[in-house]
Amino acid sequence: MATDFLFPKIADCSYVSCYCEENVWKLCEQVQRTRPEELSKCYAVFVSNEGRTVPLWRQKAGRGDDQVVIWDYHVFFMHNPLPNRCLVYDLDTTLPFPTYFHKYVTETFRSDLALRPEHHRFFRVIPADTYLIEFSSDRRHMRRPDGSWIKPPPSYPPILSNTNMHCLGDFICMSAGKGPGAVYSLSEFVQYFYKSPHVVAQHNK
């Protein structure tokens, strides 16, 4: 891999376990601050489905040799600077940081064909600049009924937009036509973002 990564070291990234949506927001913020010319090529990607049961492999929280886990949702960061160069930055994966799109999708999501329909994955892809403006979370989803934390929150204040106290559900929702960005099935997601070098070469002739 080349070394012109947006985030050379995972240790230099803001990270709090179980707050993936905020971790990715912080990555977008870092690009806006340090590499603003690249922000338009970056995306926040939410993974979920109607039942909020999505299996992912190669996750630090996963079990067994395949490190599989079932999340209610997950969020990762993508940088797509060229047609045949899309990199995924997932702070919760056991794959390299970053990983090329095709390898990440193949090892993390595998295929929907072997899964029950209720476990099929959908992807809400939001441009990074939109995510920075519209995302807002007061972290209520991480509190128990008695007000205690399910997992300790980040030390910085909640990320709040000017218009909404808590809109996390709009990002997790996978209904087309609702919420920011665009929603894709797994096959649509791959078709949209994966361009093999051969296909790109043919297109450029």
Swiss-Prot record:
Top-level taxon in the UniProt lineage: Eukaryota
Coiled coil: none
Species, as recorded: Drosophila mojavensis
Pfam families according to UniProt: Nt_Gln_amidase
Quaternary structure annotation from Swiss-Prot or TrEMBL: Monomer.
Reactions catalysed, as given in the entry: N-terminal L-glutaminyl-[protein] + H2O = N-terminal L-glutamyl-[protein] + NH4(+)
Keywords, alphabetical: Hydrolase
Stated name of the protein: Protein N-terminal glutamine amidohydrolase
Listed InterPro entries: N_Gln_amidohydro_ab_roll_sf, NTAQ1, Prot_N_Gln_amidohydro_ab_roll
Family, as annotated: Belongs to the NTAQ1 family.
One function term, GO molecular function aspect: protein-N-terminal asparagine amidohydrolase activity
EC number(s) recorded for this UniProt protein: 3.5.1.122
PANTHER family: PROTEIN N-TERMINAL GLUTAMINE AMIDOHYDROLASE
Record function comment: Mediates the side-chain deamidation of N-terminal glutamine residues to glutamate, an important step in N-end rule pathway of protein degradation. Conversion of the resulting N-terminal glutamine to glutamate renders the protein susceptible to arginylation, polyubiquitination and degradation as specified by the N-end rule. Does not act on substrates with internal or C-terminal glutamine and does not act on non-glutamine residues in any position.
Active-site residue numbers: 20, 74, 90
Uppermost EC category: hydrolase
GO cellular component: cytosol; nucleus
Span of the signal peptide: none
